[in-house]
Amino acid sequence: MKKYLVIGNPIGHSLSPLIHNYWMKKYKLVDSVYEKRMVEENDLKKVIEEIRKDEVVGVNVTVPFKKLIIPFLDKLDFVAEETQSVNTLFKINNQIVGHNTDSAGFQDSLKEFYPRSNNSMMSLPLEDKHIFILGAGGVTASVISALKSEGANNIFLSNRTKEKANELKKLFPEIEVIDWGKRPPICSIVINTTSIGLTKDEEINIDFNNYDMNHHKDFLFYDLIYNPKETVFLKKARLRGNKTMNGKTMFLNQAKYAFNIWTNIMPEIDDEVIKFLD
């Protein structure tokens, strides 16, 4: 039996096993199973040894280990190196490689809101967008990397702990860090990468009066949280007439790319998969 894992702490809420086990059944990988495992930091070395011994084929890594896992790996792909964030592990030529599929997953999700022109090689129309990111956690670097690759060059970042925001600025010197509670003078996309909103009624310190569709016809509020489907952040934005998006599409697409790394199969995100998140 080929075993795949998602590791994190906490991990009970993870929907990854539902998605990957569905795909394994759909594509007749009958000798494969995907499980979730709660681990501590001192368990990471053991997980890596399981991969080396072929006891585990592939692993997804979630909070808080996306950076902490890196010292145990032999190699990183380009995006994982750039972001210093890993969410997928796979052994290639006896080397355990850390991949980042979060960035591609986020990139794909933006295509729903900013579809490409007829030339599929063109970047999304983000060059003139002023983008405001809230949070500086494990996935934020992946979001910045995706935005940069699509031509965004006006990125503002704010985090409750300014030191963490400044750490990201070392990776991406072109971003501008602003104090928590303040906002950039111009903005057309606001992205929440914090965990604020996972608990009912949690609110982000943001003045919605400054973000109305009257000012920007394509204003977007994006929350990486997908459960609940509509956070207070998104609900307030929607009620003021702004367009909103949650993290469901990003989550499904990052899973799709991880599955492809492990199996060389690009799975379809069909209605059954989407139901798991509804």
Explain the meaning of each model-derived region:
Residues 111, 127-128, 147-154, 162-181, ...:
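Nucleotide and nucleotide-moiety/phosphate-recognizing core
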Residues 158-162, 225:
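N-terminal Rossmann-fold cofactor-binding loop
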Residues 2-114:
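Phosphate/diphosphate ligand-binding glycine-rich loop within oxidoreductases
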Residues 8, 98-103, 110, 114, ...:
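Glycine-rich adenosine-cofactor-binding loop
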Residues 173-244:
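Rossmann-like adenosine-cofactor binding region
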Residues 61-68, 137-139, 195-198, 227:
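Short glycine-rich anion-binding loops that position phosphate/pyrophosphate groups of nucleotides
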Residues 128, 217-220, 224-278:
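Adenosine-phosphate binding glycine-rich loop
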